[in-house]
Amino acid sequence: FYSSILPNLYSYILVHSKRISTEALNSQAAALRMRGRPKVVLARTYEEAMEYYDKYADNILGVISDVRFPKDGVKDPEAGIKLLREIRRRDEFVPLILESSETNNREKAEKEGFRFVDKNSKKMNIDLRHLMEEHMGFGDFIFRDPKTRKEVARIASLKQLQDNIFNIPYDSMLFHIS
C-alpha cells in the first residue's frame, strides 16, 4: 500500500511547494521556500510513530495513519486508532486522517472525530488530496464567518490576500488570526 500512496503524496506536496515558491520575490527566496516544504515521515510501528510525533510535534501539519500495524511488538488491529487518539489527546487541533480497507473503520474514525479515507475507493488519491487541502492547509485559505461557518472569502496567493485584505469581514479576520 505504501508504494502506491507515497509517490502520489510526494508529487502532490512537490506541486504545492512549487506553487508557493513562485510567489517568492527572488530566486534565493524561492529556493528557501522549496527547502522549507513539508516532509513526509513513514513510521512502521506505533512506537516509531510516537517517537516521530514527539520529535516533530511543533511542526506537524497532520497525521495520516493506517489502522492495523505493530504496537508493543505485536500486530494490533486498532493501533492506528490508538495512535490518533493519543495524538488528539496531546493536540486537539492537528488534522488526523485514518485510512483503511475495512469500511467498518469509517464509523470508528468518525466517532473519534478523525477524517477517513477508504483504501478500496477508486478515487482514494482524490479523497486524500481533498482532505489535505481542506484540513492541512494545502489548498486555498478559506475565510469563514465565525458564527455560520460559511465561506466569506477564498485566497489562493499572497497577492490575492494583499488585494483583498480590506474586503474580508473584520470578525472573520479576527476569528482566523486568534
Task: Describe the residue ranges of each PLM region.
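Conserved acidic segment of CheY-like receiver
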Residues: 1-30
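Active-site residues of response regulator receiver
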Residues: 64-73
